[in-house]
């Protein structure tokens, strides 16, 4: 409820202890809130899924977070993502969405998930975004585009972005 989230927020800003469950509740509420704002504003929401961050505790301690010790994660994504998108869709508040994954084992999962929430209001409303980070290389891009073309429509693909455009220069 809004009251529970307000209470957790109060605890967070006061520095009081917040349980892992309360952190999860707060993060979930914020994610839904921002998704509603994206829909309201007509913005596209983008989710980059699957990064396992700051894996080396020794180097994290000496160099700090986000200094290059990340890897591909193997998180359970299908059920939580489906519940999140379904919640937004069931209230007609699902914004145009692009899903990017970091684990090539999730290609078919995301390619099919995007098909579950197309509604005809916007062509390509749900997109399986281009390969990124560790998959932003020839094999990763081919795997992503093969999954998309096998499970969905390549003609509605949002296209490549950032460094991915350099694939045209590969020998």
Language model features: what each stretch is:
Residues 96-100, 128:
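Short catalytic-loop micro-motif centered on adjacent basic/acidic residues
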Residues 67-74, 131-136, 167:
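Short, contiguous acidic/charged loop-to-helix segments that flank catalytic cores in large enzymes
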